[in-house]
């Protein structure tokens, strides 16, 4: 894709227009300089921008990584005797390590976080869920000094047998270019393994 096509793509993307409209609502007299755009095929992935903005004559740091909204799903499994949580274990290059986290994914252009949540659960765990099984917890910023990302948090409750839980544990999943394995854990191990702010926030908000 050439530079002109990229400009047309990011200018019309939901993530960029939403971010720009929010800036226009809350600030005046700013200039947006888009430095680079990462494309995922023909779709806009990430946008790196610098905003020239002053408030009362003081220049405000404006380096921004625009990635749009995401979803994260606290996946709880209940058997007759125990309660478990499903974590995904995968390499995360920005932190230089493999980490445990909740099933999650980026929003698409549909702007439907509930629909994306269901899709991500199926892709990352192989579990099919119904809307009545989950509830919305909250929407939170992840790193507002760097990125526009808002994560919509959901809590899903599934009923399974101990045998079904056993089959789910250590399952290899994920789509192309993903290397994901599942870990089914109790609450104590969830707190020990999941060191993401999103994971800990979800557990707190779900009050489980």
Report the location of each language-model feature:
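Phosphate/diphosphate-binding loops
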Residues: 123
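N-terminal leader/linker segments that precede catalytic domains of diphosphate-processing enzymes
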Residues: 1-99, 106-119, 127-177, 183, ...
